[in-house]
């Protein structure tokens, strides 16, 4: 919408504007073509995504009321549960692992494996369920992944998993809930 309005102003304007950028001349039309790139670099895409009806946006106070203290700290403060403490480590039944915050299905139990790390690990998520970002909390870059619907932090991706992906989605158990096969998945939280 913004780009269309800006283009319309350009089309109706009889003034030709040039912009100086690091010693080069950029005509207005060239500048307008680059607006989407600039806006996405400034985080505009996050604003648009937050308005998507599929997204679940709640403030931290709301999440604190809905979740256990540990789940809140992991999901929305990017904490990590202590290794070996999740009962989901031993979960081997067929079923689906859903986000503990919004109930979005994230992993099929068929993609879970024993990684020996002390956290539930998967080699493949359900399509479109996760988003990623880079974090530097341990100084070196790691790929963090989160629920694409509510943004809740789930864990990190490592390149030491089994075939066919070679990936290990190392998940905080407190960020997941397990739904056994044959039981209805919970409704998505609103």
Regions found by a protein language model. Give the residues of each.
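N-terminal secretory signal peptides and thylakoid transit peptides that target proteins
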Residues: 17-39
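Short cysteine-rich clusters marking metal-coordination/redox-active sites
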Residues: 99, 147-150
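Short, non-ligating residues that shape and space the ligands of small metal-coordination modules
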Residues: 108-109, 156-157, 179
């Amino acid at each position: 919408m913004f780009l269309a309005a800006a283009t319309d102003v350009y089309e109706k304007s009889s003034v030709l504007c040039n912009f100086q950028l690091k010693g080069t001349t950029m005509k207005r039309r060239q500048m307008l073509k680059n607006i989407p790139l600039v806006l996405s670099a400034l985080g505009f895409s996050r604003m648009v995504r937050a308005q998507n009806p599929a997204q679940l946006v709640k403030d931290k106070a709301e999440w604190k009321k809905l979740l256990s203290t540990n789940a809140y700290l992991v999901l929305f403060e990017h904490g990590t549960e202590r290794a070996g403490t999740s009962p989901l480590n031993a979960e081997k039944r067929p079923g689906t692992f859903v986000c503990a915050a919004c109930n979005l299905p994230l992993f099929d139990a068929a993609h879970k494996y024993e990684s020996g790390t002390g956290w539930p690990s998967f080699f493949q998520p359900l399509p479109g369920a996760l988003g990623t970002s880079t974090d530097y909390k341990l100084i070196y870059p790691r790929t963090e992944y989160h629920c694409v619907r509510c943004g809740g932090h789930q864990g990190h991706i490592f390149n030491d998993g089994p075939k066919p992906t070679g990936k290990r989605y190392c998940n905080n158990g407190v960020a997941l809930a397990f739904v056994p096969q044959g039981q209805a998945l919970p409704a998505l939280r609103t």
